Amino acid sequence: MITQAQLYHGWMQSEELQHLTASEPLTLEEEYSMQQSWLHDANKCTFIIIEKQEFKRSGNEIGSMVGDTNLFLQEPEDSQSAEIEIMIAEEKARGKKYGWEATLLMLCYGCEVLGIKKFQAKIGLDNVKSISMFSKMGFNKVSESNIFQEVTMERIVDNGWKTWLLEQTQGSEQVKD
């Protein structure tokens, strides 16, 4: 049976995903090492995105994975700020709002559990779908880098936005391990 690291490693061989995530390809050993370091790093938070119907059908967590979403907590001097990322790696899962739902759930988790007050997303300039999604979530463009070919978007957490987030995620299901 394939491991989570092996599946992720396979995804990250895609030049498209490397471009969209600004990632370099890793060896399988490096992938295992990175996943172990993330597991023990208190400044990183990852949710694995599982396609619910596939999981119900197969009972296979790894085979049901379609992507992930991450929070990178900023250094201690700015502990109420985090960078958010989203990746729907499985092509067949794109365009089904999984990224939307997973991002909203991660934002809620960041607000409710971690006390995050400001979120930031760094997105490739040509990733129009992600820029549009974060705009619809109330993020605003704060900078653009032609050198890094990315736009930085931010959202300050306020009561109105937090209420909107909670309304958007009503009925969503988080599976805790």
State the predicted function of each range.
Residues 1-93, 113, 140-177:
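GNAT-family acyltransferases
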Residues 90-96, 125-126:
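Active-site acidic-Proline motif in GNAT/NAT acetyltransferases
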Residues 93, 97-106:
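Conserved acetyl-CoA pyrophosphate-binding loop and the N-cap/start of the following alpha-helix
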Residues 100, 114, 125-143:
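Conserved active-site alpha-helix within GNAT-family acetyltransferase domains
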Residues 81, 110-124:
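Conserved GNAT acetyl-CoA-binding A-motif
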